[in-house]
Amino acid sequence: MSNFGVIKRDGSRAEFEIQRIINAIKKAASAVNISDEFYCHQIGQEVGNEIFTRHQGEIDINQIQKIVEDKLMASRYPEVARAYIEYRHDRDLAREKRSQLTKEIEGLIEQSNVELLNENANKDAKVIPTQRDLLAGIVAKHYAKHNILPRDVVEAHEKGEIHYHDLDYAPFFPMFNCMLVDLEGMLSRGFKMGNAEIEPPKSIGTATAVTAQIIAQVASHIYGGTTINRIDEVLSPYVQISYEKHLKHAQEWNVPDVEGYAKALIEKECFDAFQSLEYEVNTLHTSNGQTPFVTFGFGLGTSWQSRLIQQAILKNRIRGLGKNHKTPVFPKLVFTIKKGLNQNKGDPNYDIKQLALECASKRMYPDILNYDQVVKVTGSFKAPMGCRSFLGAYEEKGHEIHDGRNNLGVVSLNLPRIALESKNEEDFYRTLDERLAIAKKALMTRIARLENTKARVAPILYMEGACGVRLKADENVAQIFKNGRASISLGYIGIHETINALYNKGHIFDDEQLREKGIAIVRHLSEAVKRWQKETGYAFSLYSTPSENLCDRFCRLDTKKFGVIEGVTDKGYYTNSYHLDVEKKVNPYDKLDFEMTYPPLASGGFICYGEYPNIQHNLKALEDVWDYSYDRVPYYGTNTPIDECYECGFTGEFECTSKGFVCPKCGNHDSTKVSVTRRVCGYLGSPDARPFNAGKQEEVKRRVKHL
């Protein structure tokens, strides 16, 4: 019987030992002053016989305890049974107090778990709604790890070999990651939200107000980013409706310049509508305990109505929020540049590009999408979902479909860990393939969790049009994720550290051979997801993980296992996906050339960016970099110092220390009297108010300028 197994409370398997049962019975007997060695052994043997007779190969620990209780209750010493049950109850309580679940809950209540509190720079863990969400996340994560996910997937996650993203939401809940909302379909056809039947809007002000409500509802039903794709074109009909109202009123009142009057009013109404939308987004709290992580894609509209929306979005962002004109973190703005439309002087929308440059120099956003490169890399044009997740091309009935599609989730690989474990390159790729197998298994659990989900769990998504469909309450939602309509992504982190650990022969930027080695690793990952797509029919994609929290977590776990290793674990963070080491001093053009090879391989998610000094008075320099990027990368972001001190009036770059941010002029570090804005990964954060985790803070501190 030595091979008979016991399934412990954490799901692990141990060898059955009858002596442990006998010892527990002895303790219970001793507690009620009964000394009967034969009795204890006899009950132990009876328990063992029943286990071996009725169970094949293994038994759950709780089943064993139930059998022991039944045998004791039927014995000549029922008081021993009572003592055993009380003893077990006390042990259960003590065990519960020592459990990881209890420790994490206490860390939240006592505000002592810094890792949890600073995990997401968009969540203010000091306020009750966020704490409630974090508490739910702790429980959901615990349940998923113990009752839903396969044991080997959980172990790989716990060890830091992979990272199962957003475990605090899915797979406990049948939720997905990020999406492009079908705003056009919802507004044009109407929909129901809560108790209200929403009809098509009759003005741009109403359209933006409804858009804000849609964003809040959608963001509460998913755990990733919410993107409104081509918002300037989607909302342009409502600008026209408002304009026609103003024309009609002018005619009714015999206004001399009817068109001039209507144009003046619609410009004001459009500006106010998007100002309200920006304020709504930044004052809303979703049920996820955070401001909606929302992205607006715009810039391709050519009508005067679309141009007016583009101008309103950018002018409102330049103006800022509130009396101090603070830089808003959301919505993330993504402006599209296209040859013949707005790239060069003489293009009809070149003036909008100039406004976008001014805005980026003052507010960091907008990031830019280079139209031709987005099409080349992803197969069609669309904005990113959230900060960097991109969908591939997909058609229905001969028409390209983008809006209403989504990403089902991400599992990321710890590449530096594999390099640290490997003796040579051959060993690295052998282990990488093993980790790829477990990552695929983990990703398939995301698909499986959604297979029998009914539309009624998220009416806004599946019944009212956000996902581009109007299913009935009892219809399964899995059908809309198949055949490439939704993506599901393999992520990765730390190409820089992986190359250092594996080859230890200099900086990847300076060595052409090392560059090829880094590209080869990502190509290997890209080939793997293509195979998975053929095997399953689902649109697996390779995603360059933003790693806001992961840069810290993976490095921390690897330091614990391997120690401090120069060039790998010594910084306290891992470099974001394929990005150039943040400490490497190069110009923005060379940085673009270094990174441009990766997005075509990792077409499911990417961004490139540059670090700049204050360039508000040198927009030509920024435009030159934007233009250089056009034929090289699909997606580019501008990081520039825009911090403000409300004590002394300083504007520029605050000093970044391991403990926070300090005004270089007056030393002010009061978070209520400063505005500090930094790019976290693909999106911005306000680390003065909501601190980064230790690894991300260190990474931000080490960033050097590229111009």
From Swiss-Prot:
Catalysis: reaction(s): a ribonucleoside 5'-triphosphate + formate + H(+) = a 2'-deoxyribonucleoside 5'-triphosphate + CO2 + H2O
A single GO BP: DNA replication
Record-linked Pfam families: ATP-cone (PF03477), NRDD (PF13597)
Residues recorded as bearing Glycine radical in the entry: G682
One GO term describing the cellular component: anaerobic ribonucleoside-triphosphate reductase complex
ATP-cone domain: residues covered: 4-95
Keyword annotations from UniProtKB, A to Z: ATP-binding, Metal-binding, Nucleotide-binding, Organic radical, Oxidoreductase, Zinc
Transmembrane in keyword set: no
Residues engaged in binding Zn(2+): C645, C648, C663, C666
Reported regulation of activity: Activated under anaerobic conditions by NrdG, a tightly associated activase. Activation involves the formation of a glycyl radical at Gly-682.
Glycine radical domain location: 584-707
EC number: 1.1.98.6
NCBIfam families (alphabetical): NrdD, PRK09263.1
PANTHER family: ANAEROBIC RIBONUCLEOSIDE-TRIPHOSPHATE REDUCTASE
Subunit structure: Forms a tetramer composed of two NrdD and two NrdG subunits.
Annotated family: Belongs to the anaerobic ribonucleoside-triphosphate reductase family.
UniProt function note: Catalyzes the conversion of ribonucleotides into deoxyribonucleotides, which are required for DNA synthesis and repair.
Entry protein name: Anaerobic ribonucleoside-triphosphate reductase
